[in-house]
């Protein structure tokens, strides 16, 4: 028969901290504390597999579970000298959840289980405090009624508030035993009125009702949401911990509290926490009474006139402080600890690794490494790479009031406040006038780049995490919320229409690009700080990692920002972004609208010095580091005007007939531009465009090498190649231009020509394509689109539904799809290197900044990842963790093999 139950108590436990997967975090740590000889109330843990079995079998308890729980309770009875269900010396229980990953507050708890109309008298007699017994009973009815029976907790709150008002009491603690009895009678009446059922008096019925409720809470909406947000698989299930109750509400020599072994906000090495005298655990969290400081130093710092635990109960405090230090040394991490003091006796109820801010995490990791508790590699592995966003961008003050008017996708982290503007030109003008703005659009296009650059933040009602707005905003480090479908933009009347409010141009909003929230008004911000601890962790990370980290950048500002964050080159320079500046877009349009090659070459001659100067600046900033430049990729219609007003204006500037321009725009329109006339197909149709870009690159390389003294080896990348012949055609044109420039300059130029792998055919035919390529860069944005057959700009319409319904666990445009897209990358890497040993491989899609995707890149043997500038520190840390993890896995495999 399966073993469903593991017991602990009296210094012995069947499990340990190693059994987290089986016993959940809480159960494993209770067992571990027990094995360490710490004062832990006896109990039992029902394994996570029992939860999965219960949910899979239509909420039916697994065979053998009831018998094993009964055996565990018998052991608890022997240790405590109390009997479950007895009316003289009743054993009361707590029933708590405990998943293997910490999910604070997401699942259910029941305390004081086992009380009924008879045993409450025995509890009062035994404790010598009738009021305590009736208070415990009403808490149990309230909790059980809500969690197990499904009666809204507000029903109980209304009864209690009504009774307090009738009696003239302010606090719960003022009610007497008799008064609590009256509240309990009303509670039971309310339950019967709502459900038509009496409150259960049989402790066995109570116990199994509570166990079932905790199992079921694994699938409650808030738990499901939390799992989605934190990447916790639904298949893990939760353990259930059934433990003998100890009471912090047994008078003024009793207390309950929560503490951290270091400050979770700052990371300072100090005992940090709160407690309440004469209270149960949930009172500390509920905020019904103001908690007191644990240490005297904290009390003095806070200015509180209430005594600290250190002063009030010095013996219990001294023991608690000693245990806290021992637990931190044992687990080698900052601990979050729950405790109860029952009539002077200290009991440990929980320990777990404490949640902490990014700033605190850095300090704790660095300090512990320098204290010798952990190694530098362990310190690097302790930091959540995604949390570094908190350090690189302003964030909303967590204590600030939020007036949320809508929400979308957290497309680019950080928070921003400004006046609403509805066009990019307005954004630029407002900034010239010294005003801060949020650019609000249905969706953005490349022509909005000037407004996006000027705005403090960007809000779009359409688009996903890899939409134009999201990608560009991340690259610029500008906060962005995309796909806010609950908000409507009335462009004509310049209105932002939300469910609760309609706002006009000039009204102030705040966007939180880290959560996706859109808020009315100006909200207080916290400014980012990069501490010395950040620098140390990055230094240790760089010493550990194998892959290099480049950036996606095409502007000097982006390139400088990326260098300051530690980028080791440019992995993707999107040359088309350089053509959207005001002084260039019309020259580009002149080229597109030219009637023949001669006309195109005339316009391209005007663009050449512009591109060359851009490349000179990028090469100079990178000072000898690799720079990968992608030739023109998007379809030409993206550069053309769209509305009648825009067409009229462009026709005026180019001195052509608006009707003729409209006709040309319509002729270039494509039904599916993502799969249309773009990438290398443009270079083959109009080779003069690729030739101009190649000349600009080579001339810039010569000049930058002369100016800086650093060797410049440009890497020219041909996009959207599916056939080797396509690459061969474009490569021949590039090499011809290189030969011309070398002859003109009288100096040799080293360069590489490679391709983006962004089509499934290219991945499958990588062996032949590698014969003509010096490097591959995986363009995972398009490779994901073409593998799934999903347009990333439309994906937001249904991918969220897919996640909610469990069809996919992650948005494949945010975190790489390892099974499909990932396999294509592995195939291309293996086949490409089989043809050309040492072929350089990198990734330059948005996945280059995603920690899970970076881990995959390490496993696939890629040489570098490339991401937006503000994600470079995240990628450096994630790449180091991937290397460390890979080394550990290899060591385990080698050990197993021997």
Swiss-Prot record:
Region (N-terminal): 1-355
Active site: 468, 844
Positions annotated to bind Mg(2+): 758, 782
Protein origin, superkingdom: Bacteria
Single GO term (MF): ATP binding
C-terminal: region residues: 547-898
Modification after translation: Phosphorylation of Thr-466 in the dark inactivates the enzyme. Dephosphorylation upon light stimulation reactivates the enzyme.
Keywords: ATP-binding, Kinase, Magnesium, Metal-binding, Nucleotide-binding, Phosphoprotein, Transferase
Function: Catalyzes the reversible phosphorylation of pyruvate and phosphate.
Misc: The reaction takes place in three steps, each mediated by a carrier histidine residue located on the surface of the central domain. The two first partial reactions are catalyzed at an active site located on the N-terminal domain, and the third partial reaction is catalyzed at an active site located on the C-terminal domain. For catalytic turnover, the central domain swivels from the concave surface of the N-terminal domain to that of the C-terminal domain.
Domain remark text: The N-terminal domain contains the ATP/Pi active site, the central domain the pyrophosphate/phosphate carrier histidine, and the C-terminal domain the pyruvate active site.
Protein name per its UniProtKB record: Pyruvate, phosphate dikinase
Lineage: Bacteria, Pseudomonadati, Pseudomonadota, Alphaproteobacteria, Hyphomicrobiales
Gene: ppdK
């Amino acid at each position: 028969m399966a073993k469903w139950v593991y017991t602990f108590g009296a210094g012995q436990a069947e499990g340990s901290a190693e059994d987290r997967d089986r016993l959940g975090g809480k159960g494993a740590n209770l067992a571990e504390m027990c094995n360490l000889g710490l004062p832990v109330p006896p109990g039992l843990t029902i394994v996570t597999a029992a939860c999965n079995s219960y949910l899979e079998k239509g909420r039916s308890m697994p065979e053998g579970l009831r018998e094993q729980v009964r055996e565990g309770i018998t052991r608890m009875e022997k240790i405590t000298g109390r009997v479950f269900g007895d009316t003289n010396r009743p054993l009361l229980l707590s029933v708590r959840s405990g998943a293997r990953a910490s999910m604070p507050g997401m699942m259910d708890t029941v305390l004081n289980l086992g009380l009924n109309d008879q045993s409450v008298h025995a509890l009062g007699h035994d404790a010598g405090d009738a009021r305590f017994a009736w208070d415990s009973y009403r808490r149990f009815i309230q909790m059980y009624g809500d969690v197990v029976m499904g009666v809204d907790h507000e029903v109980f709150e209304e009864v209690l508030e009504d009774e307090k008002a009738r009696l003239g009491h302010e606090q719960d603690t003022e009610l007497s035993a008799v008064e609590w009895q009256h509240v309990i009678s009303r509670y039971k009446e309310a339950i019967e009125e709502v459900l038509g059922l009496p409150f259960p008096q049989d402790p066995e019925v109570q116990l199994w009702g509570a166990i079932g409720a905790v199992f079921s809470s694994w699938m409650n909406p808030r738990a499901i949401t939390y799992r989605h947000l934190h990447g916790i698989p639904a298949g893990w299930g939760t353990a259930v911990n059934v433990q003998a109750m100890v009471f912090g509400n047994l008078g003024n020599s009793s207390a309950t509290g929560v503490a951290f072994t270091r400050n979770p906000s700052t990371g300072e090495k100090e005992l940090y926490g709160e407690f309440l005298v004469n209270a149960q655990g949930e009172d500390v969290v509920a905020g019904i009474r103001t908690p007191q400081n644990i240490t005297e130093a904290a009390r003095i710092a806070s200015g509180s006139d209430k005594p600290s635990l250190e002063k009030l109960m010095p013996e219990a405090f001294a023991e608690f402080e000693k245990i806290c230090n021992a637990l931190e040394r044992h687990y080698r991490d900052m601990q979050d600890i729950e405790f109860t003091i029952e009539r002077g006796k200290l009991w440990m109820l929980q320990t777990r690794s404490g949640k902490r801010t990014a700033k605190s995490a850095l300090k704790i990791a660095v300090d512990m490494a320098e204290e010798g508790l952990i190694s530098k590699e362990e310190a690097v592995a302790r930091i959540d790479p995604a949390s570094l966003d908190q350090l690189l961008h302003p964030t909303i003050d967590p204590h600030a009031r939020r007036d949320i008017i809508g929400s979308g996708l957290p497309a680019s982290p950080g928070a921003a406040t400004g006046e609403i503007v509805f066009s990019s030109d307005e954004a630029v003008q407002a900034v010239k006038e010294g005003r801060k703005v949020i650019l609000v659009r249905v969706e953005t296009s490349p022509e909005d780049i000037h407004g996006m650059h000027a705005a403090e933040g960007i809000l779009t009602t359409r688009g996903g995490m890899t939409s134009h707005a999201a990608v560009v905003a991340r690259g610029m480090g500008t906060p962005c919320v995309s796909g806010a479908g609950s908000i409507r933009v009335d462009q004509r009347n310049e209105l932002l229409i939300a469910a609760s409010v309609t706002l006009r141009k000039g009204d102030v909003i705040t966007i939180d690009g880290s959560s996706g929230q859109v808020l009315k008004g100006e909200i207080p911000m916290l400014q980012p700080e990069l501490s010395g601890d950040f620098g140390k962790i990055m230094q240790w990370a760089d010493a550990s990692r194998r892959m290099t980290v480049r950036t996606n950048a095409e502007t000097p500002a982006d390139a400088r920002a990326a260098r300051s964050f530690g980028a080791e080159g440019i992995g993707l320079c999107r040359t088309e972004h350089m053509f959207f500046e005001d002084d260039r877009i019309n020259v580009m349009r002149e080229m597109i609208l030219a009637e023949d090659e001669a006309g195109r070459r005339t316009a391209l001659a005007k663009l050449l010095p512009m591109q060359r100067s851009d490349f000179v600046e990028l090469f100079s900033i990178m000072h000898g580091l690799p720079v990968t430049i992608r030739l023109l990729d998007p379809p030409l219609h993206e550069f053309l005007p769209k509305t009648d007003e825009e067409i009229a204006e462009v026709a005026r500037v180019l001195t052509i007939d608006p009707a003729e321009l409209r006709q040309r725009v319509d002729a270039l329109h494509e039904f599916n531009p993502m799969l249309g006339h773009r990438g290398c197909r443009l270079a083959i149709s109009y080779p003069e465009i690729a030739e101009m870009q190649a000349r600009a690159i080579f001339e810039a390389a010569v000049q930058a090498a002369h100016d800086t003294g650093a060797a410049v080896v440009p890497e020219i990348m041909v996009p959207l190649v599916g056939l080797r012949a396509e690459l061969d055609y474009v490569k021949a044109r590039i090499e011809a231009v290189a030969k011309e420039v070398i002859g003109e300059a009288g100096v040799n130029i080293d360069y590489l020509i490679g391709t983006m792998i962004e089509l499934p055919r290219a991945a499958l035919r990588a062996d032949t394509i590698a014969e003509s390529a010096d490097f591959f860069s995986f363009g995972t944005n398009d490779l994901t689109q073409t593998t799934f057959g999903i347009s990333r700009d439309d994906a937001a319409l249904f991918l969220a539904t897919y996640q909610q319904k469990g069809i996919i666990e992650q948005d494949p445009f945010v975190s790489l799809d390892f099974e499909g897209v990932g396999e294509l990358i592995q195939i291309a890497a293996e086949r490409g290197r089989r043809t050309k040993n040492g072929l350089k491989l990198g990734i330059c899609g948005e996945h280059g900044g995603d920690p899970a995707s970076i881990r995959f890149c390490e496993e696939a043997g890629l040489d570098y990842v490339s991401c937006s500038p503000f994600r470079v520190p995240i990628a450096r840390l994630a790449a180091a963790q991937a290397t460390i993890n890979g080394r550990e896995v290899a060591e385990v495999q080698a050990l197993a093999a021997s």
